[in-house]
Amino acid sequence: AQNALLKTIEEPPEYAVINTIMYGISQALAGLSGAAAAVLMYVFQSVFNFFVVSGSGQAAITMPIMAPLADLLGVSRQTSVLAFQLGDAFTNLIVPTSGCLIGSLAIAKIEWSNWIKFMWKFLGILMIGAVITILIAVAIGF
């Protein structure tokens, strides 16, 4: 049974659902430059981090789609991983679905709404820096 599972993972069926998903996404994003596609990957990962805070869980769900999508859109896989890492990183500072954040705020007796008021400018600076980093990565072929 284990060999059959490995064979299925290594050689997916010709008409796998993932192929349909990849085709649809790539057609929707076909006119974008590599830089714009990479930035959209970052934005998607940042938003997705709200729903799946776990970095490894997020990678397991999104990277099987993001890595081949990067290939189709002319973005290196390294840059797609960078977009994933940055998208997973900074939004952890504000997402209310993060147990670590909410637990830390509870111990410090800080309301989440007050935390957002305090953090939004800093998070904006971090996100602008992340976009610049991604654009540089695309420009140098990282």
Regions found by a protein language model. Name each.
Residues D88-A89, L93-F142:
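Juxtamembrane and boundary regions of transmembrane helices in multi-pass small-molecule transporters
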Residues N3, P12-P68, L72-L73:
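Hydrophobic alpha-helical transmembrane segments of multi-pass integral membrane proteins
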Residues L5, I9, S33, A60, ...:
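Membrane-interfacial segments
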Residues M66-L69, S80, S104:
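Extended, hydrophobic alpha-helical segments in both membrane/secreted and soluble proteins
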Residues L5, I25, L29, S33, ...:
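Structural signal for hydrophobic packing residues in well-ordered secondary-structure cores
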Residues R77-Q78, W112:
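Alpha-helix N-cap/start motif
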